[in-house]
């Protein structure tokens, strides 16, 4: 199997995976934010397709999803947005299973995966779809050459972890702490243990949940991660911009700076440039 | 008809196409641990768990609840109508069957904290009662809107020393309360058990909640044989999430399993018609643009999808966003329904129907006036559905709960909607 775009994004040192919610607060603003995040050093864009019942999200992303839905974001508008992205980085679609299930024929994920592949999506992260229920989505992803990224949690047992490592493609999403998404000050003590348990795999390992600063990014890559995933810290920045009525370009500048800080922090965690 | 007619069958948590375990990975180990505990303690009665449960639901809960003949209702409908009196269970609703069972199970599992969601507050109060009785710390999540309109239940939970956390996100009702409870569980998963309030959620919840609630239909079968000399021709129950529904139907379907049941009370009884009555609200249908359904009729009008851990029938938009539902009865106001019910509707074993707000209000007043029983507004939907019953054998209506909690709503809505059957209250207005 040839290496996917997603896996290749981790080849040149620690990767920065940056998450924003599509359509928060408008599709045009999201497009501008994505350009800024890539400018700041983002290697993978994780673009949230908003669902009304986001059980894995903390308050920050719940509110962003509400803003995006209130502004009219839909799966079709999402795919249009993805198709318009110029930046040369892979885009991972992060959403909940019901939206994939309902698209097109309303009978499973195949129709959405096909449309997503067409629009330029490289893979999926679906937080309410554990590996146990992932058969139909895996099959659809395989048919279209897309990756399906599984989340390894701090509670994940050894046998579940090995099952996921067998099936995950692109990278493995290491959930850095129990609970929901949301920016935190500290790196969870669970993170080094989680990474140690994944040492035996060649699949790139990216840590998410709670990462918000360059210093945290440094700690995480120093613990052996191949990348960091940041979401709520960006979304907080977007929310502040909405609250203060700042123009999207101003918000985009802040996002670029934050991405640059995170990327530099992640790079600092690795003693020398690493070439796999 | 059912896929699980054998009591000893270990299900994989699917009912035809429905069910499953659609939850974040962080919860999956807890879900697997719970599945194992369900199979050992509930299905196999390990350590005498089910004996313990049966003893406590009698001595603390007040089981068995009676099966009461309703003479005036019988005359009105031209068939013998009986009422299964879950309104007389401790707490005033069937909810305690499940809450006591799950809190006790959590104790057997060595968990030391309980969380639960509640809509109208009935499941929250039942869980708080069970936790007080079994000395378990308890936190309840309840939508802000529901906190405001169900104050007495908030006080009841507080009296039992439960913490009540208002949920402000979204419309502040049951759906958001479930989301927030799942988030708490995902954060405190090692020591916490989530007592889900209906036959919804990931496996094993739909099966386990059904089994605890099926003590209703187990009793009902024994009482029918004794009092009617035969099984009823039909059982009618309201359906929101569906816990009283599966409780009233479970033993007849044959899928429920609770060790220690009297012989023959859990064998499939395909000749008994089962009618699940949903909230038709003010009208049927989904308003796609507004993301709103003026009803809660997911079983009779919904489409297949995935919500709160299971594949089931849902009220959703064309693109798959879950809509806000509506019913005059807060306990039926939910956009999803238990996956086993969805399956049993597809196989034809259960007949789904719905009753609108006004018909439920009228039935509320009829039962109060004619039979001396004030039913919950949820139950009132099942009573109203007697009008749709065209069989001639005896019928049992499951009185899922008592209506004291609904008096404010009923008086207000009866005046606003001009319900003929309502008593004149005007003279008491200031």
Swiss-Prot record, chain A:
Oligomeric form and interacting partners: Tetramer of two alpha and two beta chains.
Chain's gene name: trpA
UniProt function note: The alpha subunit is responsible for the aldol cleavage of indoleglycerol phosphate to indole and glyceraldehyde 3-phosphate.
Organism: Halobacterium salinarum (strain ATCC 700922 / JCM 11081 / NRC-1) (Halobacterium halobium)
Signal peptide from the UniProt entry: none
BP GO annotations: L-tryptophan biosynthetic process
Enzyme nomenclature, EC number: 4.2.1.20
Pfam families in alphabetical order: Trp_syntA
GO MF assignments: tryptophan synthase activity
Protein name: Tryptophan synthase alpha chain
GO cellular component, one term: cytosol
Family, per entry: Belongs to the TrpA family.
Name of the top EC class for this enzyme: lyase
Pathway note: Amino-acid biosynthesis; L-tryptophan biosynthesis; L-tryptophan from chorismate: step 5/5
UniProt-listed HAMAP family: Trp_synth_alpha
Active-site residues per Swiss-Prot or TrEMBL entry: 46 (proton acceptor), 57 (proton acceptor)
Curated annotation (Swiss-Prot), chain B:
Cofactor(s) it depends on: pyridoxal 5'-phosphate
Biological process terms in GO annotation: L-tryptophan biosynthetic process
PTM annotation (N6-(pyridoxal phosphate)lysine): residues: 95
Record protein name field: Tryptophan synthase beta chain
Keyword vocabulary terms for this entry: Amino-acid biosynthesis, Aromatic amino acid biosynthesis, Lyase, Pyridoxal phosphate, Tryptophan biosynthesis
UniProt cross-references to SUPFAM superfamilies, sorted A to Z: Tryptophan synthase beta subunit-like PLP-dependent enzymes
Name of the coding gene: trpB
Role: The beta subunit is responsible for the synthesis of L-tryptophan from indole and L-serine.
PROSITE patterns linked to this entry: TRP_SYNTHASE_BETA
């Amino acid at each position: 199997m040839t290496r996917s775009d997603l896996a290749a994004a981790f080849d040149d040192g620690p990767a920065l995976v940056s998450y924003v919610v599509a359509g928060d607060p408008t599709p045009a603003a999201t497009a501008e934010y994505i350009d800024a995040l890539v400018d700041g050093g983002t290697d993978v864009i994780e673009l949230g397709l908003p669902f009304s019942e986001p059980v894995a999200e903390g308050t920050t992303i719940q509110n962003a999803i509400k803003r995006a839905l209130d502004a009219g974001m839909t799966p079709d508008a999402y795919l249009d947005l993805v198709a318009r992205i110029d930046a040369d980085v892979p885009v991972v679609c992060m959403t909940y299973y019901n939206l994939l299930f309902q698209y097109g024929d309303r009978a499973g994920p195949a129709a959405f995966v096909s449309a997503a592949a067409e629009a330029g999506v490289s893979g999926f992260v679906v937080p309410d779809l554990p590996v146990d229920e992932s058969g139909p989505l895996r099959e659809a992803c395989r048919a279209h050459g897309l990756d399906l990224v599984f989340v390894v949690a701090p509670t994940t047992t050894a046998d579940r972890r090995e099952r996921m490592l067998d099936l995950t493609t692109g990278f493995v999403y290491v959930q850095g702490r129990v609970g929901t998404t949301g920016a935190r000050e500290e790196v969870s003590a669970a993170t080094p243990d989680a990474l140690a348990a994944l040492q035996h795999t060649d699949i790139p390992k990216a840590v998410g949940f709670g990462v918000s600063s360059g210093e945290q990014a440094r700690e995480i890559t120093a613990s052996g991660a191949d990348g960091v995933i940041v979401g709520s810290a960006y979304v907080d920045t977007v929310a502040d911009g909405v609250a203060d009525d700042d123009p999207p370009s101003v918000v985009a500048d802040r996002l670029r700076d934050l991405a640059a800080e995170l990327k530099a922090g992640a790079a600092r965690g690795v003693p020398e440039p690493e070439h796999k | 008809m059912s896929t699980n007619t054998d009591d000893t069958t270990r299900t994989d948590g699917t009912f035809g196409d429905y069910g499953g375990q659609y939850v974040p990975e962080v919860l999956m180990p807890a879900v697997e641990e719970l599945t194992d505990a369900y199979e050992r303690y509930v299905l196999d009665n390990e350590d005498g768990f089910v004996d313990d449960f049966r003893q406590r639901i009698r001595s603390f809960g007040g089981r068995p609840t009676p099966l009461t003949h309703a003479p005036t209702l019988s005359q009105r409908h031209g068939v013998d109508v009986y009422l299964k009196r879950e309104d007389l269970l401790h707490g005033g609703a069937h909810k305690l069957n499940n809450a006591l069972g799950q809190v006790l199970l959590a104790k057997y599992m060595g968990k030391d904290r309980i969380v639960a969601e509640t809509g109208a507050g009935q499941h929250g109060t039942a869980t708080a009662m069970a936790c007080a009785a079994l000395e378990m710390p308890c936190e309840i999540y309840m939508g802000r809107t529901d906190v405001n309109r169900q104050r007495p239940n908030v006080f009841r939970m507080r009296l039992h020393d439960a913490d009540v956390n208002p949920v402000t996100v979204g419309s502040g009702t049951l759906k958001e309360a479930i989301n927030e409870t799942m988030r708490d569980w995902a954060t405190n998963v090692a020591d916490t058990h989530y007592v889900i309030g209906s036959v919804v959620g990931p496996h094993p919840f739909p099966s386990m909640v059904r089994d605890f609630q099926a003590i209703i239909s187990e009793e009902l079968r024994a009482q029918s044989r004794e009092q009617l000399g035969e099984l009823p021709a039909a059982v009618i129950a309201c359906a929101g999430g569906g816990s009283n529904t599966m409780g009233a139907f479970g033993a007849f379907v044959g899928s429920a399993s609770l060790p220690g049941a009297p012989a023959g009370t859990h064998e499939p009884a395909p000749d008994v018609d089962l009618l699940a009555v949903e909230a038709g609200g003010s009208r049927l249908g989904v308003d796609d643009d507004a993301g709103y359904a003026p009803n809660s009729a997911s079983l009779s009008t919904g489409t297949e999808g995935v919500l709160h851990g299971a594949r089931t029938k849902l009220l959703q938009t064309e693109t798959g966003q879950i809509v806000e539902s509506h019913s005059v009865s807060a306990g039926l106001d939910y956009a999803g329904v238990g996956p086993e019910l969805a399956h049993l509707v597809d196989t034809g074993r259960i007949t789904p129907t719905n009753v609108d707000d006004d018909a439920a209000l009228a039935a509320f007043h009829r039962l109060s006036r004619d039979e001396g029983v004030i039913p919950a507004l949820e139950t009132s939907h099942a009573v109203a559905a007697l009008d749709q019953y065209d069989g001639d054998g005896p019928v049992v209506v499951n009185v899922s709960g008592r209506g004291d909690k609904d008096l404010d709503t009923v008086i207000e809505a009866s005046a606003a909607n001009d319900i003929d059957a309502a008593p004149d209250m005007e003279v008491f207005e200031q």
